[in-house]
């Protein structure tokens, strides 16, 4: 995957969102689609710099919403990495690196009011890296910042999974005041389960929340306990805002 994946401590500058075991997934999929249409490609594929006289034949770009929807609703990590590098490319142009992305995220954290943003470790776009370190406080400050910017909030909130309805929360909090109310992103890595997002309390107050449970796993039931605790907290917040 690139930076932050433990085996890349040699500061490898090649960072692509769809890179597995030195195999370019995009090129493989593209060649496969060409073959389906009777077009066969010989030789090897890889990444190279374009010659100065190269002409663009075609450009395909998906709307941001169509990428962020599966990224947030279904926790699609491919999309998350792609958005991370697309953000850097938009700001810096070709040759985007993870380090540039890390700098951009920390600047946004500072703008959102996160104190000492440099102390947090942001190394990738998906959050799957074992080197990522954030806190519930930092996440709530980012959620608050989005809420304070109406266009961002309206766009972002409607793409989050909805409790008891869709995405990674479709089977959770059903039959409670949190169902259809909680809009939140789940997070799952080894030993960690998290949930952060928004809900509306019974008094009409809008609440941003972040819950991170560490030291849990699926083998001893602690992961399920963590999810149940998260759901219960959301139910209590939705029913009893005091």
Provide a role label for each language-model segment:
Residues 1-155:
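A small/polar active-site loop signature that marks catalytic segments
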Residues 84-242:
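Small-residue-rich helix-loop
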């Amino acid at each position: 995957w690139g930076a932050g994946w433990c085996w890349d401590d040699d500061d490898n500058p090649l960072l692509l969102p769809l890179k597995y075991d030195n195999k370019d997934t995009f090129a493989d999929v593209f060649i496969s689609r060409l073959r389906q249409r009777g077009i066969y490609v010989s030789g090897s594929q890889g990444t190279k710099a374009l010659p100065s006289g190269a002409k663009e034949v075609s450009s395909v770009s998906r709307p941001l919403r169509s990428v962020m929807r599966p990224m947030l609703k279904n926790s699609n990590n491919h999309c998350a990495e792609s958005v991370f590098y697309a953000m850097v490319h938009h700001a810096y142009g070709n040759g985007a690196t993870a380090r540039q992305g890390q700098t951009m995220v920390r600047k946004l954290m500072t703008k959102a009011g996160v104190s000492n943003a440099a102390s947090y470790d942001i190394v990738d776009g998906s959050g799957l890296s074992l080197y990522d370190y954030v806190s519930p406080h930092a996440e709530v400050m980012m959620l608050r910042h989005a809420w304070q910017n109406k266009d961002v909030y309206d766009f972002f909130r409607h793409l989050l999974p909805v409790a008891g309805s869709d995405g990674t929360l479709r089977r959770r909090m059903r039959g409670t005041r949190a169902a259809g109310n909680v809009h939140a992103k789940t997070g799952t890595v080894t030993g960690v389960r998290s949930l952060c997002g928004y809900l509306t309390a019974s008094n009409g107050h809008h609440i941003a929340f972040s819950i991170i449970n560490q030291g849990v796993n699926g083998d001893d039931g602690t992961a399920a306990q963590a999810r149940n605790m998260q759901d219960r907290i959301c139910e209590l917040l939705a029913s009893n805002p005091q």
